[in-house]
Structure formats: C-alpha cells, structure tokens
C-alpha cells in the first residue's frame, strides 16, 4: 500500500501553480517534446516493412495530424499528479518517462474518440483545422484510422509499463474507460438520432448519464486514476473518493462545453459548434425545455435538429429569449461551490490541491 510519501507539496495544473511563466512553459514543452518519441515508438520498426510499411506510414500521418494540437490537459494531468503523489524513490528519470508515456496514451485515446466522433457528428473543424475525415483523400477511411489510434494506446502501454507492477491496473483502467465512453457515445446517439427529433427524450437524468459515461470517466477520472495506480494507490476506497469528485468535475466541464458550442468564439474554441444541427441532448436544450411556454416549445420542435442556418439562428434566439446565458452563469457559480464542497469531503488522504488545481483550470474557461 502506498504510504503517500511526499504528498504535502502543493499541486495544481501546470498553468496554475505559482511558478514563473518560463517554468510553466518548460513543463508543457517537456510533454509536447516527448511526442516525437511516441511516434518513433509506434512507427520506426514498421515503416520499412515490406508488407505493412505503407500502412505504418499512414499511421504516422494519422498520429501527427490528430494527436497533438490540443490543450493536452489530460496528459499533463497524469504527469503533474504523478509528480505530486510519487515518493522519493519513484522520481527517477525512467519512472517519469513512463508518466509522460501514459499521459500520451490518454491523448491518443482522446484522438481516437475525436476522429470517430467528428464523423458521427459530421463536424467540420477540430482544434482549428479541418476534421481528419474532411481532409482530401481520407473520408470514411478515418474510421479505420481511429481504430489504429486506439490500438496505439496499448502498444505504448506495453512498451513503457509491461515490467511495472501497475501494468495490469492500467490495462484494465483503459479497457474499462473505453467501454464506459463508448456506452456514453451510444446513449448520445440513440437519445438524439439525426433523422428524428423527439425532445421528450431530453431529460436531465438522461443528460447526466450521457455526460458521465461519454466525457467524465475518460477526461477526469482516467488521468488521475492512472497516476494513482502508478504510485501504488490501488485501494478501492481511495479510487471511489477520487471518482466522486472527478465525475462531478466532468459534468461541470461538459456543461461548459455545451455552452461554448453555442455561445463560444470559434476563434478561441478551435471548432464550429454543431449541437443544434446535430439534435444533441445538450445542457442548453434540456434547460430551455424547462423554461419555455407552449408556443416557444413548438418553435423549438420546428427548428431544433435542422441543418438550415435560419433554423439554427431561431433556436439561438430562443436561448437568448429564455435567458440561457444568465442560467449558465448561475450554474457555473453554484457548481464550482459544490465542487469545492465535494473536494473538502472526499479528498481525505489525497492532497486537495490535485482536485482544486483541476477545478481552477476549467473554471470560466473560454475554450
């Protein structure tokens, strides 16, 4: 059992610690700078292979287009949490390389989901560039590319962690999280099929289930849980305590995402929102349904889930009319207070700063 050696020093997401901008940038550069090594690990041996060399060359292109370019919050969280939780005997260079590799496993995991999700949502841009499937010559071949990104996760885990006592824990964690995320995606798809608009399915309970499974497990619990296993924190109680905080944080994050999809600046978010056109069970439409008059509900029925720009505009006008901007601001304040209460209640033997740093990182974000 891990003795929690060295967990008293304060931890926050790299951008939030009281460090100089130079140090913050160095930590990010260290993580981003490890990516070429990940690409080499995954492609170097296969690129010249007489049988599969062409396919591995394609994998290299897929990796370089889809894995970098994001904020890297999930991957950076693994590394920062590992540094905070690890004892003196766990801070050697090789152990830190393992943490960097596991961080990149989560970024590859994210890329796998996003490539597939963009196809299903018929999205146009991602991280300020064309979605991979929209690139000339890619199209639906991107489905197989997403599979390659997923299998890359397990190849990296094997290379860096196979000899480590936590290897099986990480394998099971990634496999379970993939299943949970895919269940969440399925809930999302069957709740709001593109071909049929039925707002009666858009309940708060269903929305919370979609968010928990589709976003919260892999975006918040997975990075922290991975770091916990890597330092030997494997008790069910500690993981349940962390999960109670992190799943709530994931819900908060997704509600922000839904708000930014409609009201955010694409120049900041890097993507053009499509939730209204895609008939998504988003926080905005669920809350709007609780506020509308019968006439306004009919307007929503007639215009939600339609591709025409004028119909999308009518939904946005309705959101303004029923006060969704103010409703979100009120939610953001109350949810942040609730998160702080949960952290106080559940962080027990884990340092509160891990959770407070994550919460502060996403509070009032614009992208």
From Swiss-Prot:
<feature type="binding site">
    <location>
        <position position="254"/>
    </location>
    <ligand>
        <name>dimethylallyl diphosphate</name>
    </ligand>
</feature>
<comment type="pathway">
    <text>Isoprenoid biosynthesis; farnesyl diphosphate biosynthesis; farnesyl diphosphate from geranyl diphosphate and isopentenyl diphosphate: step 1/1.</text>
</comment>
<keyword id="KW-0460">Magnesium</keyword>
<feature type="binding site">
    <location>
        <position position="74"/>
    </location>
    <ligand>
        <name>isopentenyl diphosphate</name>
    </ligand>
</feature>
<feature type="binding site">
    <location>
        <position position="110"/>
    </location>
    <ligand>
        <name>isopentenyl diphosphate</name>
    </ligand>
</feature>
<keyword id="KW-0443">Lipid metabolism</keyword>
<feature type="binding site">
    <location>
        <position position="215"/>
    </location>
    <ligand>
        <name>dimethylallyl diphosphate</name>
    </ligand>
</feature>
<dbReference type="GO" id="GO:0045337">
    <property type="term" value="P:farnesyl diphosphate biosynthetic process"/>
</dbReference>
<keyword id="KW-0756">Sterol biosynthesis</keyword>
<dbReference type="InterPro" id="IPR033749">
    <property type="entry name" value="Polyprenyl_synt_CS"/>
</dbReference>
<feature type="binding site">
    <location>
        <position position="214"/>
    </location>
    <ligand>
        <name>dimethylallyl diphosphate</name>
    </ligand>
</feature>
<protein>
    <recommendedName>
        <fullName>Farnesyl pyrophosphate synthase</fullName>
        <ecNumber>2.5.1.10</ecNumber>
        <ecNumber>2.5.1.1</ecNumber>
    </recommendedName>
</protein>
<dbReference type="GO" id="GO:0005737">
    <property type="term" value="C:cytoplasm"/>
</dbReference>
<keyword id="KW-0414">Isoprene biosynthesis</keyword>
<feature type="binding site">
    <location>
        <position position="280"/>
    </location>
    <ligand>
        <name>dimethylallyl diphosphate</name>
    </ligand>
</feature>
<keyword id="KW-0752">Steroid biosynthesis</keyword>
<dbReference type="GO" id="GO:0004337">
    <property type="term" value="F:(2E,6E)-farnesyl diphosphate synthase activity"/>
</dbReference>
<feature type="site" description="Important for determining product chain length">
    <location>
        <position position="112"/>
    </location>
</feature>
<comment type="function">
    <text>Catalyzes the sequential condensation of isopentenyl pyrophosphate with the allylic pyrophosphates, dimethylallyl pyrophosphate, and then with the resultant geranylpyrophosphate to the ultimate product farnesyl pyrophosphate.</text>
</comment>
<dbReference type="GO" id="GO:0004161">
    <property type="term" value="F:dimethylallyltranstransferase activity"/>
</dbReference>
<comment type="similarity">
    <text>Belongs to the FPP/GGPP synthase family.</text>
</comment>
<feature type="binding site">
    <location>
        <position position="126"/>
    </location>
    <ligand>
        <name>dimethylallyl diphosphate</name>
    </ligand>
</feature>
<dbReference type="InterPro" id="IPR008949">
    <property type="entry name" value="Isoprenoid_synthase_dom_sf"/>
</dbReference>
<dbReference type="Pfam" id="PF00348">
    <property type="entry name" value="polyprenyl_synt"/>
</dbReference>
<keyword id="KW-1207">Sterol metabolism</keyword>
<dbReference type="GO" id="GO:0033384">
    <property type="term" value="P:geranyl diphosphate biosynthetic process"/>
</dbReference>
<keyword id="KW-0963">Cytoplasm</keyword>
<feature type="binding site">
    <location>
        <position position="121"/>
    </location>
    <ligand>
        <name>Mg(2+) 1</name>
    </ligand>
</feature>
<feature type="binding site">
    <location>
        <position position="117"/>
    </location>
    <ligand>
        <name>Mg(2+) 1</name>
    </ligand>
</feature>
<feature type="site" description="Important for determining product chain length">
    <location>
        <position position="113"/>
    </location>
</feature>
<dbReference type="GO" id="GO:0006695">
    <property type="term" value="P:cholesterol biosynthetic process"/>
</dbReference>
<keyword id="KW-0153">Cholesterol metabolism</keyword>
<dbReference type="InterPro" id="IPR000092">
    <property type="entry name" value="Polyprenyl_synt"/>
</dbReference>
<feature type="binding site">
    <location>
        <position position="121"/>
    </location>
    <ligand>
        <name>Mg(2+) 2</name>
    </ligand>
</feature>
<keyword id="KW-0753">Steroid metabolism</keyword>
<comment type="subunit">
    <text>Homodimer.</text>
</comment>
<feature type="binding site">
    <location>
        <position position="117"/>
    </location>
    <ligand>
        <name>Mg(2+) 2</name>
    </ligand>
</feature>
<dbReference type="InterPro" id="IPR039702">
    <property type="entry name" value="FPS1-like"/>
</dbReference>
<keyword id="KW-0808">Transferase</keyword>
<keyword id="KW-0152">Cholesterol biosynthesis</keyword>
<feature type="binding site">
    <location>
        <position position="271"/>
    </location>
    <ligand>
        <name>dimethylallyl diphosphate</name>
    </ligand>
</feature>
<feature type="binding site">
    <location>
        <position position="127"/>
    </location>
    <ligand>
        <name>isopentenyl diphosphate</name>
    </ligand>
</feature>
């Amino acid at each position: 059992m891990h003795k929690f050696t060295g967990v008293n020093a304060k931890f926050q997401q790299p951008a939030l610690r009281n460090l100089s901008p130079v140090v913050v940038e160095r930590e990010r550069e260290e993580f981003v700078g490890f990516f070429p090594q990940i690409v080499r690990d995954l492609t170097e041996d296969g690129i010249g292979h007489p049988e599969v060399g062409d396919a591995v060359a394609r994998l290299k292109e897929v990796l370089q287009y889809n894995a970098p370019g994001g904020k890297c919050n999930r991957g950076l969280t693994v590394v920062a949490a590992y540094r905070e939780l690890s004892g003196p005997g766990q801070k050697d260079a090789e152990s830190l390389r393992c943490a960097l590799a596991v961080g990149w496993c989560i970024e590859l995991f994210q890329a796998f989901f996003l490539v597939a999700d963009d196809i299903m949502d018929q999205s146009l841009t991602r991280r300020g560039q064309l979605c991979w499937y929209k690139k000339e010559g890619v199209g639906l071949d991107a489905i197989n590319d997403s599979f390659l990104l997923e299998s890359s996760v397990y190849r990296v885990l094997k290379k860096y962690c196979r000899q480590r006592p936590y290897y099986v824990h990480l394998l099971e964690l990634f496999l379970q999280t993939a299943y949970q995320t895919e269940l969440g995606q399925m809930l999302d798809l069957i709740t709001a099929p593109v071909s049929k608009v039925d707002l009666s399915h858009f309940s708060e309970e269903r929305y919370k289930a979609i968010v928990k499974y589709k976003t919260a497990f892999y975006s918040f619990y997975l990075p922290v849980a991975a770091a916990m296993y890597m330092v030997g924190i494997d008790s069910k109680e500690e993981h349940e305590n962390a999960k109670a905080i992190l799943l709530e944080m994931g819900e908060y994050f997704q509600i922000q995402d839904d708000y930014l999809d409609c009201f955010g600046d694409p120049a900041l978010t890097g993507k053009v929102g499509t939730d209204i056109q895609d008939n998504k069970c988003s926080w905005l439409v669920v809350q709007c349904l609780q506020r509308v008059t019968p006439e306004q509900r009919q307007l929503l029925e007639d215009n939600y889930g339609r591709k025409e720009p004028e119909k999308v505009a009518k939904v946005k006008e309705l959101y303004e009319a029923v006060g969704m901007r103010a409703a979100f601001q009120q939610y953001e304040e109350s949810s942040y207070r609730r998160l702080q209460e949960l952290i106080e209640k559940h962080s027990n033997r884990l340092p509160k700063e891990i959770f407070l740093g994550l919460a502060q990182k996403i509070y009032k974000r614009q992208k």
